[in-house]
UniProtKB/Swiss-Prot annotation:
<dbReference type="InterPro" id="IPR021153">
    <property type="entry name" value="HrcA_C"/>
</dbReference>
<keyword id="KW-0804">Transcription</keyword>
<keyword id="KW-0678">Repressor</keyword>
<dbReference type="GO" id="GO:0003677">
    <property type="term" value="F:DNA binding"/>
</dbReference>
<comment type="function">
    <text>Negative regulator of class I heat shock genes (grpE-dnaK-dnaJ and groELS operons). Prevents heat-shock induction of these operons.</text>
</comment>
<dbReference type="InterPro" id="IPR036388">
    <property type="entry name" value="WH-like_DNA-bd_sf"/>
</dbReference>
<protein>
    <recommendedName>
        <fullName>Heat-inducible transcription repressor HrcA</fullName>
    </recommendedName>
</protein>
<dbReference type="InterPro" id="IPR002571">
    <property type="entry name" value="HrcA"/>
</dbReference>
<dbReference type="InterPro" id="IPR036390">
    <property type="entry name" value="WH_DNA-bd_sf"/>
</dbReference>
<dbReference type="InterPro" id="IPR029016">
    <property type="entry name" value="GAF-like_dom_sf"/>
</dbReference>
<keyword id="KW-0805">Transcription regulation</keyword>
<keyword id="KW-0346">Stress response</keyword>
<dbReference type="Pfam" id="PF01628">
    <property type="entry name" value="HrcA"/>
</dbReference>
<comment type="similarity">
    <text>Belongs to the HrcA family.</text>
</comment>
<dbReference type="InterPro" id="IPR023120">
    <property type="entry name" value="WHTH_transcript_rep_HrcA_IDD"/>
</dbReference>
<dbReference type="GO" id="GO:0045892">
    <property type="term" value="P:negative regulation of DNA-templated transcription"/>
</dbReference>
Length: 347
């Protein structure tokens, strides 16, 4: 890349930094005064004219300054050399806050609240997908001699409880045998394999336990093949009102705050945006029209997966106006996702 291209990118970077910070269109004079670009005002004006002609910046109708376009933000994000990592104390504070969660629901709620506070944007976390989980443990509890409570615990920390009505009374010794049979078929297996294993268990079980096994297996298969991952925790929507001007259609940004709020109410829209994240090692940035959601054309979505040992439990991310602190937000999303995965995998 030529020195001219590098210089023009520095001008673009400075425009992005100033506009994100001030929300005011940026002029060449301000750039020269605020940034050590090492060139004259005339050169900066020429570079800005080039950036505008190429579609990286645009001129709002009401100002002589320029603002970044979606294309400009994309160029900026793609050329971020280093995302400033969080400090040791910041990382410890995040981990300690999440570790204080009493269960899966609490950990995810804490994660959303924390991410919304760190980024001052809308934060969203997807509940762990059962299809990507493994069975850590199955507990079988006798509520009465003819009624059982099955407690299924996955490696992502998800807990599902189901009631089984038995045809006959089950003695304590038989309960232990049933617990061993079901646990042996399920524990350590991915849920898809576990559902097959437990469905086949009836043919292999002792005759005196067959009815209890069939009834338990029926309930477990229903649990294992459900898809409760279509659940989200959302937080920080009040942050949208702080940035309401960004959704007013000014500066060439289409859409409105109302349209964004309506889109957030449709979980399928948010799940689609999180679906762009396929692993827990990469942060995905979708800017403006890249979201492919009409109501979200004035927004950016920064997301990644959370999980452990190479398994993605679900997605986590933030949504806000395209005018956002991309380096800081990327770092926050990555850190919170990492520690949510660590906390859940240790439970």
């Amino acid at each position: 890349m030529s020195s001219t291209d590098d210089r023009r990118f520095e001008v673009l970077r400075a425009i992005v930094a100033d506009y994100v910070s001030t929300q005011d269109p940026v002029g060449s004079k301000a750039l020269v005064e605020r940034h050590n670009l090492g060139v004259s005002s005339a050169t900066v004006r020429n570079d800005m004219a080039f950036l505008e002609a190429e579609g990286y910046i645009a001129q709002p109708h009401t100002s002589s300054g320029r603002v970044p376009t979606d294309k400009g933000y994309r160029e900026f994000v793609d050329r971020i050399a280093d995302v400033k990592p969080m400090s040791g104390p910041e990382r410890r504070a995040i981990l300690e806050f999440l570790e204080s969660g009493v269960d899966l629901d609490d950990v995810l709620r804490r994660g959303v609240r924390l991410l919304a506070q760190l980024t001052r944007q809308v934060a969203v976390v997807q509940y762990p997908s059962l299809s990507a989980s493994s069975v850590r443990h199955l507990e079988v509890v006798a509520l009465t001699p003819a009624r059982l409570l099955l407690v299924l615990i996955t490696d992502s920390g998800r807990v599902d409880q189901r009631i089984v009505e038995l045809g006959d009374v089950l003695e304590d010794e038989d309960l232990s045998r049933l617990r061993a049979l079901l646990g042996g078929a399920l524990e350590g297996k991915r849920l898809a394999a576990a559902s097959i294993a437990v469905a086949e268990l009836a043919d292999e079980s002792p005759a005196d336990l067959r009815d209890a096994v069939i009834r338990s297996a029926t309930v477990l298969v229903e649990t294992l093949v459900e898809h409760p991952e279509d659940r989200l925790v959302l937080g920080g929507t009040s942050n949208l009102t702080r940035n309401a001007a960004d959704f007013s259609g000014l500066a060439g940004f289409p859409g409105s705050l109302r349209a964004v709020l309506e889109a957030l109410e449709e979980q399928v829209v948010v799940l689609k945006l999180l679906a762009a994240t396929q692993n827990s090692g990469t942060v995905t940035v979708q800017i403006g029209e890249e979201t492919q959601v009409e109501q979200m054309r004035g927004t950016s979505v920064i997301s990644t997966g959370y999980g452990a040992a190479g398994t993605v439990f679900g997605g986590v991310g933030v949504l806000g106006p395209t005018r956002m602190d991309y380096p800081g937000t990327i770092a926050s999303v990555a850190a919170v996702a990492r520690y949510i995965g660590e906390v859940l995998s240790e439970r």
